[in-house]
Amino acid sequence: MTDPPRPDPFPVTRLDSDAGALFVLQSKGEWWHAGFHLTTAIVGPTILTLPYAFRGLGWWLGFVCLTTMGLVTFYAYYLMSKVLDHCEKSGRRHIRFRELAADVLGSGLMFYVVIFIQTAINTGIGIGAILLAGQCLDIMYSSLFPQGTLKLYEFIAMVTVVMMVLSQLPSFHSLRHINCASLLLSLGYTFLVVGACINLGLSKNAPKREYSLEHSDSGKVFSAFTSISIIAAIFGNGILPEIQATLAPPATGKMLKGLLLCYSVIFFTFYSAAISGYWVFGNNSSSNILKNLMPDEGPTLAPIVVIGLAVIFVLLQLFAIGLVYSQVAYEIMEKKSADTTKGIFSKRNLVPRLILRTLYMAFCGFMAAMLPFFGDINAVVGAFGFIPLDFVLPMLLYNMTYKPTRRSFTYWINMTIMVVFTCAGLMGAFSSIRKLVLDANKFKLFSSEVVD
């Protein structure tokens, strides 16, 4: 006997008066557009951190963790897309992570838990994208004008102004061409960096390689869990329901194609960057492999043209990443500020959009300039945020929706993943906080030096 239909707490009819849904999360996209959005959300300059993550794990454990994270996140995103498809077929199409979690878990509290975690992640990534883009400009400026007087916060201000302009693109769907370019840019700088690493590794100027781990057992454990948190954060996105919302209904089956496109790019970029960077620099790998290729002292270890192009590609992609992760904030603001009876470009809706999005980007830019040690803070946010949203909730939502029997293989796989990654997330958070405390004496507000 089937259960009686439940009343929908977020019925589709409400979307007619929901400006966040109608304007920001327009459902017009095809599966390849979802692939572009997913790739931009996951495949970013953070992949240049993978050799550094391998430094805390070593070769075989690094491969195991990278492969496991890839398989688990693909599985998790696939399960979440199935839950969204199931809800859509039941007449309850959800376009927001927070509403999906609250509906399936039957808890209004989950609505606020998810929105808090999403806001922390998305704002953190927005700040990080502006900071890294400012660093890219700083690197190019320092190369061209070694005695130049401009400071990092001035480059951050320049990036923020550009982001203010780009933020006026009204909807997630309107980013599809930018995110297609972002996919190509990620392939471009990966190809350049991997080529530079291989060329260096085969040359007579190759650095001495050492692949040993920390000497103490406690150091090995903390380094390993910090590396696991880094890899988990790199694979995370936390906005899959919002990306699936951009698909023209019915969205059933389209998200799987988008995931396959995204993970094809992931396979090429993640493994090639991790292997080539760690092979050449070993346990001297920096948190950004470009820093290894451009040491503070001594000659550059790759052709200037190659590094310059890679930095430009990274800079351009960071604009796309900042835009993608700001969409949830825009959707929340527009839901409250816009009028659905007026056009998307009407004066009534254009003026609030211009003011609110500009203020949001100004806040992100100010925080990036004030906190150039944000990498350490972001590691903590990643451990507390990405692991719950991307490694725990999808499995829980699937078990609650499809109710597999407790004897089934699927049930126990999902439970195992939830338990293992909850423990890994707690250990990773502890390790990240430990690193934050250890680096505290290096922190300076509005500094031109970024803490590694």
Swiss-Prot record:
Main location: membrane
InterPro entries in UniProt: AA_transpt_TM
Regions that span the bilayer: 34-54, 56-76, 113-133, 152-172, 182-202, 221-241, 261-281, 304-324, 354-374, 377-397, 409-429
UniProt keyword Lyase present: no
Bilayer topology: Multi-pass membrane protein
Alphabetical UniProt keywords: Amino-acid transport, Cell membrane, Membrane, Phosphoprotein, Transmembrane, Transmembrane helix, Transport
Residues with PTM Phosphoserine: S17
Pfam families: Aa_trans
GO BP term (any one): amino acid transport
Compartment(s) of residence: Cell membrane
GO cellular component: plasma membrane
PANTHER family linked: OS05G0424000 PROTEIN-RELATED
Entry's family note: Belongs to the amino acid/polyamine transporter 2 family. Amino acid/auxin permease (AAAP) (TC 2.A.18.2) subfamily.
Function (record text): May be involved in the transport of GABA.
Protein name: Probable GABA transporter 2
Protein's organism: Arabidopsis thaliana (Mouse-ear cress)
